């Protein structure tokens, strides 16, 4: 029986970490791709040489020609420029939009049946552009954002309450940026909503708001500490969770930047919402009820994403 094939487009810190995690989980054979010849080949060889020690059997290769991704079942896109201190995700738009055009053409030619996960920032605009450039069905192209943002929220909550991260569920809606919407009402500790924990005296509203703000600033906090790059371990783990749900038809309920066609009152945009990911790609978008405050915050986030998409169209009118 043929193994699944996973193409990792971009061989930087996230790409290398993705290759290692996909190998450890034996999700399939792996191709690390990058236009910088030598880097994917070197990283592929290095990770392959860890397989006898760590006990995984996959064929892991590096390549600098798009033909190497031919027939991939999953493509995870990290290609582009990473953030540096003082930069917002949006500052990357012009540079990375050109990268998405090249990547989209490569996927369209060699892996038109793949499930595509985009990580490149500014995420919501880049995954929207990538879907347009590639021509793939919208349900087969998704952005990795909500899993990461929710994971950060879960960690901060677990530390605050001194409980296991496994007993914390968290919910983050909207764009992957400063306007993201961590929803306290739909986030729980041991099944108890955060809003109830405020009433029970576990945490004050003010402290909860501080945790929510730290979640929004989660990426920038790491960029500020690293100084020469951005997060890669948690983003890679988040994308692998999505890929695994697709490859194994697990039908996980995961918050992702998904294409909306009327849901939440939004059309032809990628925004972070709860989805079900299975063998059909994004099989369902779950619409939850939002109160007035939550809806206003979500609409503000959607507006920020819409502005980025407009900026993309100004640079590449073919996207219209």
From Swiss-Prot:
GO terms for molecular function: L-lactate dehydrogenase activity; L-malate dehydrogenase (NAD+) activity. Catalyzes the reversible oxidation of malate to oxaloacetate. InterPro entries: L-lactate/malate_DH, Lactate/malate_DH_C, Lactate/malate_DH_N, Lactate_DH/Glyco_Ohase_4_C, Malate_DH_type3, NAD(P)-bd_dom_sf. Its EC number is 1.1.1.37. NAD(+) binds at residues 10-15, 34, 96, 119-121. Belongs to the LDH/MDH superfamily. MDH type 3 family. Gene3D superfamilies: Lactate dehydrogenase/glycoside hydrolase, family 4, C-terminal (3.90.110.10), NAD(P)-binding Rossmann-like Domain (3.40.50.720). The active site is at 176 (proton acceptor). NCBIfam families: MalateDH_bact (TIGR01763), PRK06223.1 (NF004863). It catalyses: (S)-malate + NAD(+) = oxaloacetate + NADH + H(+). The keyword Oxidoreductase applies. One of its GO terms (biological process) is lactate metabolic process. HAMAP family: Malate_dehydrog_3. Keywords: NAD, Oxidoreductase, Tricarboxylic acid cycle. This is Malate dehydrogenase. The keyword NAD applies. Substrate binds at residues 83, 89, 121, 152.
């Amino acid at each position: 029986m043929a193994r699944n094939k996973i193409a990792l487009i971009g061989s930087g810190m996230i790409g290398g970490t993705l290759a290692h995690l996909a190998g450890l989980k034996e999700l399939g054979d792996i191709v690390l791709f990058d236009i910088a010849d030598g880097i994917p080949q070197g990283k592929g060889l290095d990770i392959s040489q860890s397989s006898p020690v760590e006990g995984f059997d996959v064929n892991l290769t590096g390549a600098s020609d798009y033909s190497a991704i031919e027939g991939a079942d999953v493509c995870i896109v990290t290609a582009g420029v990473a953030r540096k201190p003082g930069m917002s995700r949006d500052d990357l738009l012009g540079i990375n939009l050109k990268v998405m055009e090249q990547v989209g053409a490569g996927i369209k030619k060699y892996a038109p049946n793949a499930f595509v996960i985009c990580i490149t920032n500014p995420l919501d605009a880049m995954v929207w552009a990538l879907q347009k450039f590639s021509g793939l069905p919208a349900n087969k192209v998704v952005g990795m954002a909500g899993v990461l943002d929710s994971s950060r929220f879960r960690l901060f909550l677990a530390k605050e309450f001194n409980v296991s991260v496994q007993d914390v569920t968290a919910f983050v809606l909207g764009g992957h940026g400063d306007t993201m919407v961590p929803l306290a009402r739909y986030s729980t500790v041991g099944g108890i909503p955060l809003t109830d924990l405020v009433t029970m005296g576990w945490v004050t509203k003010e402290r909860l708001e501080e945790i929510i703000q730290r979640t929004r600033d989660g990426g920038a906090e790491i960029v500020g500490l690293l100084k020469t790059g951005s997060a890669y371990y948690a983003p890679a783990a988040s994308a692998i969770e999505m890929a695994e749900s697709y490859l194994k038809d697990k039908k996980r309920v995961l918050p992702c930047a998904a294409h909306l066609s009327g849901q939440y009152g939004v059309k032809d945009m990628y925004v972070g919402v709860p989805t079900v990911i299975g063998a059909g790609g994004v099989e369902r978008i779950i619409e939850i009820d939002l109160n007035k405050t939550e809806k206003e915050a979500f609409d503000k986030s959607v507006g920020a994403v819409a502005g980025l998409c407009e900026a993309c169209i100004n640079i590449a009118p073919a996207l219209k």
